[in-house]
Amino acid sequence: MDKLTIISGCLFLAADIFAIASIANPDWINTGESAGALTVGLVRQCQTIHGRDRTCIPPRLPPEWVTTLFFIIMGIISLTVTCGLLVASHWRREATKYARWIAFTGMILFCMAALIFPIGFYINEVGGQPYKLPNNTVVGSSYVLFVLSIFFTIVGLLFAGKVCLPG
């Protein structure tokens, strides 16, 4: 197993962890209002009213966000399989070729999720339009983690494909 394979494996693992954290954290969209802060995630929606304890419930997702969640979960599975194949490539060199293609599939799934997610900004809790959030609403830390997972997946693919050679 060469250094580039190890580097790409670490990048894929980091992307996998960031994607899992983005789903687990309910901060994809944040209203940040002082009276009642609302954070909307793909698996939980949390609200804090006038300094009381934060209350979380499962959200009613629009079809666009269900599709986004599906693509992210499939991308996570792809990156997990990729990491396993990169470990297996220590004994069977041809596993690297399959790992690259599965990681590429994961990247496509993540990019599709990133394109589809903003279409769901029209829901009542957010109050925006497709691809346009209202002025008082911002994307939260979960979305940033998800974008980082896309970035690490792309850089990992560059190393796995030996496109990005050091020195």
UniProtKB/Swiss-Prot annotation:
The chain crosses the membrane at residues 7-29, 68-88, 101-121, 139-159. Its main location: membrane. It is a multi-pass membrane protein. Glycans are attached at N135. It holds the Pfam family Atthog. InterPro entries: Mosmo (IPR037663). Acts as a negative regulator of hedgehog signaling probably by promoting internalization and subsequent degradation of smoothened protein (SMO) present in the ciliary membrane. Plays a role in sonic hedgehog (SHH)-induced spinal neural progenitor cells differentiation. One of its GO terms (biological process) is gene expression. Disulfide bonds: none annotated. It is found in: Cell projection, Cilium membrane; Cell membrane. Gene3D superfamilies: 1.20.140.150. GO terms for cellular component: ciliary membrane; Golgi apparatus; plasma membrane. It comes from Mus musculus. It comes from the Eukaryota. This is Modulator of smoothened protein. Keywords: Cell membrane, Cell projection, Differentiation, Glycoprotein, Membrane, Transmembrane, Transmembrane helix.
